[in-house]
Amino acid sequence: MDDRSSKKRKLKDVNGAKASGAATDVTVKPKKLKKAQSQEEVEPKVEKGSKKEEEENDWSDEEENEAADDAGHSSDSDVDEGDDTIAAPAKEADGDIPGDLTLPTTAESEAQAFSELNLSENTMKAIEEMGFTKMTEIQRRGIPPLLAGKDVLGAAKTGSGKTLAFLIPAVEMLRSLKFKPRNGTGVIVVSPTRELALQIFGVARDLMKHHSQTYGIVIGGANRRAEAEKLSKGVNLLIATPGRLLDHLQNTPFVFKNLRSLVIDEADRILEIGFEDEMRQIIKILPKERQSMLFSATQTTKVEDLARVSLRPGPLYLNVDEEKEYSTVEGLEQGYVVCEADKRFILLFSFLQKMKKKKIIVFFSSCNSVKYYAELLNYIDCQVLDLHGKQKQQKRTNTFFEFCNADRGTLICTDVAARGLDIPAVDWIVQFDPPDDPRDYIHRVGRTARGTNKKGRSLMFLLPSEVGFLTYLKQARVPVVEFDFPTKSIKNVQSQLEKLIGKNYYLNSSAKDGFRSYLHAYASHSLRSVFDINKLDLAKVAKSFGFATPPRVDIQLGASMSKDKKAGGRRAYGSQPRQGGTYGKRR
């Protein structure tokens, strides 16, 4: 971007970061900021901390929620305080590349190494320090058009290296336009989950180590006041979750009128978890003259609708998976085991005991199931970490990084950890509760065998009534084989488990919550032909939670089965199951 002909681009001064009496105008219409403060107030100097300080402070919540404490990583020594004009290349970041431009796609015409991209010295230095030399396919095909200002709609498997694919062009753009804190936010990256946002923030921190531009993060559960303070000082590259970003756009006086680039990562997941309205509002508030990048593992109708409103006409479409034989990464050995519901827990317990020296992630379908099984396993000296959406952000952050830094151990979690997270050296992915569909399966197993020539294994538990799910996996090009577990290797701890749950009030209460949530999750499965709640054997399911007889729990089937048009009544399931132990018909 350096060697293009120069052209002047005016970036308006962010003079009113703390505009008095005009909060509404500042948020929705930043152009109405008044120059009420001195240059020094507008563009405060933010000290650049040591690497050790960054590691200790960046990720803690109340203090790191001051996760924007590191967000102010800025050097203002080269600021010309009287100059608001920023030099830009002739082809601007939101430039006028024709929508029908055909870019070369053959391997011969693509750069293979980062050093061939003509990146800035500071960016190249950071990439080398991060240990990267060769580009992945999404990086080879995505970075050059993004550097040229093209809008991109990308489809790539998790673990494909897309984080660097969108961060490198963003950082180069900020450097090229000489963004300073007073210019406000030039790049926004939207992520579906807090953990993924923290991970992207970590990559951005490493990539921007030698640049003077500022970076920060705003996520739900973090200290909102600390975030607002950092934003008011000027955050050039902002990573955010949708809900908290919309909150700040509407209620925090900060400058985003100079936005040049919007990145929407894991767009399908953002929409799946219910942020469609927030995303539409965010796009409506942000400046229209910008470059946009949208990445999604699957191209659903909703994703296409979001792409239509967020991208300019004629975006470049990149699909690095279309020619692959399988939908999952190479080096991943995938298997399943078919067992009755009452044998599920003892099989899982035996597996974890046998694999104590491995690094394992176990997926469950609900927060309460994760909570219960974590309490149970830790109580019986099978140490595990747990991660789910009901935890406070501080706990989630600490757990995530503790597991990332561990050489071995077990993390049990909900799908909050299934998307995008780059956890090093995971040996096994265990899907104790089945995924909602093949897409979720692919994202779950994507936590292992990440990177070039990496190996990993996955294991999925299926009930005999659920084997039809294998047909859907085959249609989705997912190769799985049946694993066999010798009976002699299984530790039969069922009777001890039932005694423990019978006498321990705390575990008993937690088990009931887990049992109820499991039924709710099962009732809400999208593949009803495979995961039919009426085929569940209640007595056997209860045994997997440690109950000798099913507890009496009330669930609202109508609420769970939102896709069913019929009104579902409230009914109790419990100590007197119908003949055969099944649910029978819903009322």
From Swiss-Prot:
<keyword id="KW-0694">RNA-binding</keyword>
<feature type="compositionally biased region" description="Acidic residues">
    <location>
        <begin position="55"/>
        <end position="69"/>
    </location>
</feature>
<dbReference type="Pfam" id="PF00271">
    <property type="entry name" value="Helicase_C"/>
</dbReference>
<feature type="domain" description="Helicase ATP-binding">
    <location>
        <begin position="143"/>
        <end position="317"/>
    </location>
</feature>
<dbReference type="GO" id="GO:0005730">
    <property type="term" value="C:nucleolus"/>
</dbReference>
<dbReference type="GO" id="GO:0003723">
    <property type="term" value="F:RNA binding"/>
</dbReference>
<dbReference type="InterPro" id="IPR011545">
    <property type="entry name" value="DEAD/DEAH_box_helicase_dom"/>
</dbReference>
<keyword id="KW-0690">Ribosome biogenesis</keyword>
<feature type="region of interest" description="Disordered">
    <location>
        <begin position="1"/>
        <end position="103"/>
    </location>
</feature>
<protein>
    <recommendedName>
        <fullName>ATP-dependent RNA helicase HAS1</fullName>
        <ecNumber>3.6.4.13</ecNumber>
    </recommendedName>
</protein>
<comment type="subunit">
    <text>Associates in the nucleolus with the 60S and pre-60S ribosomal subunits.</text>
</comment>
<dbReference type="GO" id="GO:0016887">
    <property type="term" value="F:ATP hydrolysis activity"/>
</dbReference>
<dbReference type="InterPro" id="IPR025313">
    <property type="entry name" value="SPB4-like_CTE"/>
</dbReference>
<dbReference type="InterPro" id="IPR001650">
    <property type="entry name" value="Helicase_C-like"/>
</dbReference>
<dbReference type="GO" id="GO:0000462">
    <property type="term" value="P:maturation of SSU-rRNA from tricistronic rRNA transcript (SSU-rRNA, 5.8S rRNA, LSU-rRNA)"/>
</dbReference>
<dbReference type="GO" id="GO:0003724">
    <property type="term" value="F:RNA helicase activity"/>
</dbReference>
<dbReference type="Pfam" id="PF00270">
    <property type="entry name" value="DEAD"/>
</dbReference>
<dbReference type="GO" id="GO:0042802">
    <property type="term" value="F:identical protein binding"/>
</dbReference>
<feature type="compositionally biased region" description="Basic and acidic residues">
    <location>
        <begin position="42"/>
        <end position="54"/>
    </location>
</feature>
<comment type="similarity">
    <text>Belongs to the DEAD box helicase family. DDX18/HAS1 subfamily.</text>
</comment>
<keyword id="KW-0539">Nucleus</keyword>
<dbReference type="InterPro" id="IPR027417">
    <property type="entry name" value="P-loop_NTPase"/>
</dbReference>
<dbReference type="GO" id="GO:0005635">
    <property type="term" value="C:nuclear envelope"/>
</dbReference>
<dbReference type="GO" id="GO:0030687">
    <property type="term" value="C:preribosome, large subunit precursor"/>
</dbReference>
<keyword id="KW-0547">Nucleotide-binding</keyword>
<dbReference type="InterPro" id="IPR014014">
    <property type="entry name" value="RNA_helicase_DEAD_Q_motif"/>
</dbReference>
<feature type="domain" description="Helicase C-terminal">
    <location>
        <begin position="331"/>
        <end position="501"/>
    </location>
</feature>
<dbReference type="InterPro" id="IPR000629">
    <property type="entry name" value="RNA-helicase_DEAD-box_CS"/>
</dbReference>
<feature type="short sequence motif" description="DEAD box">
    <location>
        <begin position="265"/>
        <end position="268"/>
    </location>
</feature>
<keyword id="KW-0067">ATP-binding</keyword>
<dbReference type="GO" id="GO:0032040">
    <property type="term" value="C:small-subunit processome"/>
</dbReference>
<feature type="compositionally biased region" description="Basic residues">
    <location>
        <begin position="1"/>
        <end position="11"/>
    </location>
</feature>
<dbReference type="GO" id="GO:1990417">
    <property type="term" value="P:snoRNA release from pre-rRNA"/>
</dbReference>
<dbReference type="Pfam" id="PF13959">
    <property type="entry name" value="CTE_SPB4"/>
</dbReference>
<keyword id="KW-0698">rRNA processing</keyword>
<feature type="region of interest" description="Disordered">
    <location>
        <begin position="558"/>
        <end position="587"/>
    </location>
</feature>
<dbReference type="GO" id="GO:0005524">
    <property type="term" value="F:ATP binding"/>
</dbReference>
<feature type="short sequence motif" description="Q motif">
    <location>
        <begin position="112"/>
        <end position="140"/>
    </location>
</feature>
<keyword id="KW-0378">Hydrolase</keyword>
<dbReference type="InterPro" id="IPR014001">
    <property type="entry name" value="Helicase_ATP-bd"/>
</dbReference>
<keyword id="KW-0347">Helicase</keyword>
<dbReference type="GO" id="GO:0000463">
    <property type="term" value="P:maturation of LSU-rRNA from tricistronic rRNA transcript (SSU-rRNA, 5.8S rRNA, LSU-rRNA)"/>
</dbReference>
